[in-house]
Curated annotation (Swiss-Prot):
Places the protein is found: Cytoplasm
Subunit note: Homotetramer; dimer of dimers.
Top-rank taxon, per record: Bacteria
Active site per database record: Y140 (proton donor/acceptor), K168 (schiff-base intermediate with substrate)
Biological function: Catalyzes the condensation of (S)-aspartate-beta-semialdehyde [(S)-ASA] and pyruvate to 4-hydroxy-tetrahydrodipicolinate (HTPA).
Any Gene Ontology CC annotation: cytosol
InterPro entries (UniProt xref): Aldolase_TIM, DapA, DapA-like, Schiff_base-form_aldolases_AS
Annotated residues for binding of pyruvate: T51, I209
Matches recorded under Gene3D superfamilies: Aldolase class I
Protein name: 4-hydroxy-tetrahydrodipicolinate synthase
Positions marked as site (Part of a proton relay during catalysis): T50, Y114
Length: 311
């Protein structure tokens, strides 16, 4: 059922966590943010991922966040819960808790960070999580954050597990092409790189788990819709204008830029939690001009070339 729920999700938004100035979660801001996303082509929502600043959230806070979002969404789109840590036992305990909590199509588990496990260690980590829970698991492969990279061969070994249903892939397009070519049936492949969505979808990926969909969901939808209708020329034209906006959204450690834009648009995204800090005021103004207005003079002042940042 989880595969069927997610198969038609082209744009899954990696939801921010709105905070008050004192650092507490701003639950009152969640309804407006969710309705904004759903009005602008979000097909699914990931909670407690990187963009949510999950390393700064306690498990209790994550469960409170889950309850608040479920109350607003009311089953209109599938939800994915961030469940993974760099400690296998903790990941198993939390994925069981989230499974019992209910209301999620899948759990997203990150490749363990800091520990620097081998490929066999990664395999055993995800196998243990998937064995322990009924909640389907999506692997999150993001070497820029965790230092180690799961190889396509290890990924395909794990793809044979009946409870591992997909991957959020943030490596190379070459790796993505290999995975798409060799994946088993009913294994979902999402890019986690907004700037790669055009290429990934043309290669045959299932969708994108996105930060930019908070602010530019309509553009992303138009691009993916053009690809689906084989209008590559139109999709490429949208992509060329979209890339500078993505670059601006990642010109400071995420989610600081997207929160700056959302705050400007009138959504109470609030600040980031330490150790992340907001983008400096003048840079935030330029980011807003790029993302909201497509101001390419601001683009030149904000980012140089195509960014592939580690954040």
């Amino acid at each position: 059922m989880a595969y069927a729920d997610l198969k038609n999700c082209k744009i899954i938004t990696a939801f921010i966590t709105p905070f008050h100035e004192d650092g507490s979660i701003n639950f009152e801001a969640i309804p407006d943010l969710i309705e904004h996303l759903l009005a602008h082509h979000t097909d699914g929502i990931l909670l407690a991922g990187t963009t949510a600043e999950s390393p700064t959230l306690t498990h209790d806070e994550e469960l409170e966040l889950f309850a608040a979002v479920q109350k607003v969404v009311k089953g209109r789109v599938p939800l994915i819960a961030g469940v993974g840590t760099n400690e296998t036992r903790d990941s198993i305990e939390f994925v069981k808790e989230v499974d019992e909590f209910g209301g999620f199509a899948a759990g997203l588990a990150i490749v363990p960070y800091y520990n620097k496990p081998s490929q066999e260690g990664m395999y055993q980590h995800f196998k243990a999580i998937a064995d322990a829970s009924n909640l389907p698991i999506i692997i999150y492969n993001i070497p820029g954050r965790v230092v180690v990279e799961m190889t396509p061969e290890t990924m395909l070994r794990l793809a044979e597990h009946p409870n591992i249903i997909g991957v959020k892939e943030c490596t190379s397009l070459a790796n993505m092409a290999y995975l798409i070519e060799h994946r088993p049936e009913e294994f979902l492949i999402y890019t986690g790189e907004d700037g790669d969505a055009f290429h990934a979808m043309n290669l045959g990926a299932d969708g994108v788990i996105s930060v930019a969909s908070h602010t530019n969901g309509d553009e992303m939808f138009e691009m993916l819709d053009a690809i689906e209708h084989n209008d590559i020329k139109k999709a490429a034209a949208i992509q060329r204008k979209f890339i500078p906006k993505v670059n601006a959204l990642f010109s400071y450690p995420s989610p600081a830029p997207v929160k700056a834009v959302l705050n400007y648009l009138g959504f109470a995204a609030g600040p980031t939690r330490l150790p992340l800090v907001p983008a400096p005021e003048e840079d935030a103004k330029r980011i807003i001009k790029v993302v909201v207005d497509g101001d390419y003079q601001a683009t030149k002042e904000t980012v140089k070339g195509v960014l592939r940042p580690d954040y």
